[in-house]
Amino acid sequence: MKVAGADEAGRGPVIGPLVIVAAVVEEDKIRSLTKLGVKDSKQLTPAQREKLFDEIVKVLDDYSVVIVSPQDIDGRKGSMNELEVENFVKALNSLKVKPEVIYIDSADVKAERFAENIRSRLAYEAKVVAEHKADAKYEIVSAASILAKVIRDREIEKLKAEYGDFGSGYPSDPRTKKWLEEWYSKHGNFPPIVRRTWDTAKKIEEKFKRAQLTLDNFLKRFRN
């Protein structure tokens, strides 16, 4: 029986893409993933994940990757959950080897609803199980999670080579916030790697626009 797992990396950052990976393997090869030490990707360092990447790919029958750009995230018509459903389905439908059972790390507080939303849009018949923290429960989801994180880390390194070191890209990172403020101060806008609909970006934009408005009003009074 073919078993698939799907997970994402990069839902929360204000900078960079969202990466979704679907991975499929013959059920009796899951023990090979266990032997590799595949587990919840959050428990592994970036170096450990990078080291596991090629080993995981060798075990898998197939995997697919969907990269969702900041522009697509900002331009979404519905919620982030709906965007994830759409792109999880895209990744699962892209698999050349179709699974009979699919395990997914649920982005929805109602895991069963998340599973049904995906199952109903698949181009093939499969049982879909969505659970919270599935990446810590099922090796095939852990494998998908590791691949997604490594692919996103590689994308982030490319962006840093072009735009400079913006830290982790998460709103809670002071380096990221400092980089965003400095970039906006210098250019009067954000580059395409930034999710402009995120509160962090919106607040910085509003702050600079208020400052500019105050300056404009001051200069207007001075000229009068």
From Swiss-Prot:
Q: Which family, according to the similarity comment?
A: Belongs to the RNase HII family.
For activity, the cofactor(s) needed are: Mn(2+); Mg(2+)
Q: How is the cofactor bound?
A: Manganese or magnesium. Binds 1 divalent metal ion per monomer in the absence of substrate. May bind a second metal ion after substrate binding.
RNase H type-2 domain ranges (all copies): 1-210
Q: Which InterPro entries match?
A: RNase_H2_suA (IPR004649), RNase_HII/HIII (IPR001352), RNase_HII/HIII_dom (IPR024567), RNase_HII_arc (IPR020787), RNase_HII_hlx-loop-hlx_cap_dom (IPR023160), RNaseH-like_sf (IPR012337), RNaseH_sf (IPR036397)
Quote the protein name from its UniProt record. Ribonuclease HII
Q: What are the recorded GO MF terms, alphabetically?
A: manganese ion binding; RNA binding; RNA-DNA hybrid ribonuclease activity
Q: What keywords tag this UniProt record?
A: Cytoplasm, Endonuclease, Hydrolase, Manganese, Metal-binding, Nuclease
Q: Which SUPFAM superfamilies match?
A: Ribonuclease H-like
Enzyme Commission number(s) from the entry: 3.1.26.4
Q: Which PROSITE patterns match?
A: RNASE_H_2 (PS51975)
Q: Please list the residues that bind a divalent metal cation.
A: 7-8, 105
Which Pfam family, giving just one, matches this sequence? RNase_HII
Q: Which organism is it from?
A: Pyrococcus abyssi (strain GE5 / Orsay)
